[in-house]
Amino acid sequence: EVKSSAVLGIILAVVILFVFLRRLGTTLIVSLAIPISIVATFNLMFFNHLTLNIMTLGGLALGAGMLVDNAIVVIESIFRNQEKGMTIREAAIAGTSEVAGAVIASTLTTIVVFLPIVYLHGASGELFKDQAWTVTFSLVSSLFVAILVIPMLYDRITGWQDRGAGGGTR
């Protein structure tokens, strides 16, 4: 049931992204970034001895949502710079630099809200500790993916499309 729900969630996310972004390349970039972020989160969870349960799945969902938000902000900034006449690589660097502060600030703010839950005592602390750690790991992973992986994917995927359309090589 979890597997089919995850697949359905990914399909719905991709369809909604395509409807609103209206560009196949950017939809593909975000679609590739989501599993990268989730795998990075799984690694952090593994090394901190967290298991996959309903609480940690909720944390993963929140982190994936924040990744999509951050990714769209970064992609739109890169796209806007590319429309100004910059090369794809220049647009990726400039666009990411322009919004990096805002993306980092919004992600860290959400982390600061969830991380103190780790220090709760009693039953509520035991209940929500795994979720708080998972949200934190997921948000940290999504931040790195949005700042480092998204610009690289944008350069590679849209650069490949441009070269295929007669744009030449770099």
Give residue ranges: language-model regions:
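Hydrophobic regular secondary-structure detector
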Residues: 1-170
